[in-house]
Regions:
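N-terminal short beta-loop-beta anion/metal-coordinating cradle
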Residues: 1-60, 65-66
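A glycine- and small-aliphatic-rich helix-loop capping segment at beta-alpha/alpha-beta transitions
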Residues: 18-24, 65, 85-96, 207
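Active-site-proximal beta-strand elements of phosphoester/diester hydrolases
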Residues: 43-48, 140-142, 187
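Structural motif
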Residues: 69-72
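Mid-sequence, gly/pro-rich, charge-dense loop/helix-turn segments that line enzyme active sites
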Residues: 80-161
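A C-terminal functional module that forms or caps the active site or interfaces directly
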Residues: 147-195, 199
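His/Asp/Glu-rich mid-to-C-terminal helical/loop segments that flank catalytic regions of hydrolases
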Residues: 194-223
Length: 223
């Protein structure tokens, strides 16, 4: 039986409404893991809270504690292009840690980690399996510890990094997964559009998350 680790930032309520009560809840130090047993897999779900660092810590915890074979992250995001509308569900092909910046000392471009491409690819095998189930749009994700509310800033990120969506956890999860040689898959759904912002996010994030959960189980059955 496969072991899947799932990192959820703040969208745990829609997930629980869709999946029901877990078979077991394990509290260990500052972590709380909800464990679901399915016919084809065991699912270890942890709510990390916002930000790259908490998401990275939770990723490492699931890998160390439960020996998960893959990491799945789902959640709501903001659109960086007017071509992407509310509640559009997508799969992340690449992640740019767009606020990472050591350029003053090493002349490496903003967003680029040493020994990695600027746009860090997610696991191709998991992406392809997900796409076999649902024909999702493949996107490039801008990840950084800041909620982007201003449409002009969104457009600037899109122009500089070629990113389609933005959020606050994917870079931390992906970098940690890569370090551990554990594949990661990211399924995202748009809450706030290009000209939306914090108000639209607050108003539509839970509805968008519910749409995303409808797709998750179909995908996980194939992983």
């Amino acid at each position: 039986m496969k072991k899947i680790g799932m990192i959820i930032a703040v969208e745990f309520t829609p997930f629980k409404e869709a999946y029901g009560e877990p078979e077991e809840v394990v509290k260990d130090r500052g972590f709380e893991v909800s464990i679901y047993k399915k016919d084809r897999y065991s699912l270890y779900v942890i709510s990390s809270g916002e930000g790259e660092v908490p998401a990275s810590i939770c990723t490492q915890y699931l890998i160390d504690k439960y020996n998960v074979e893959m990491i799945l992250n789902y959640g709501v995001v903001g659109a960086l292009s007017d071509k992407l509308g509310h509640a559009l569900t997508c799969v992340v092909k690449e992640v740019v840690d767009y606020r990472f910046d050591t350029s003053a000392i090493d002349k490496i471009p903003v967003g680029k980690h040493p020994n990695l491409p600027l746009a860090i690819p997610t696991d191709e095998n998991l992406r392809n399996k997900a796409l076999e189930v649902v024909p999702l749009l493949e996107v490039r994700c801008a990840s950084g510890d800041r909620f982007v509310d201003n449409p002009k800033e969104k457009e600037a990120i899109n122009k500089e990094f070629g990113c389609d969506i933005c959020e606050m956890e994917a870079a931390g999860i992906l970098l940690t997964s890569l370090r551990n040689n554990v594949p990661a898959l990211f399924i995202k759904v748009i809450a706030d559009t290009l000209f939306g912002g914090a108000n639209e996010y607050a108003d539509k994030s839970q509805t968008a998350a519910k749409e995303c959960t409808k797709i998750l189980e179909h995908i996980m059955d194939t992983l």
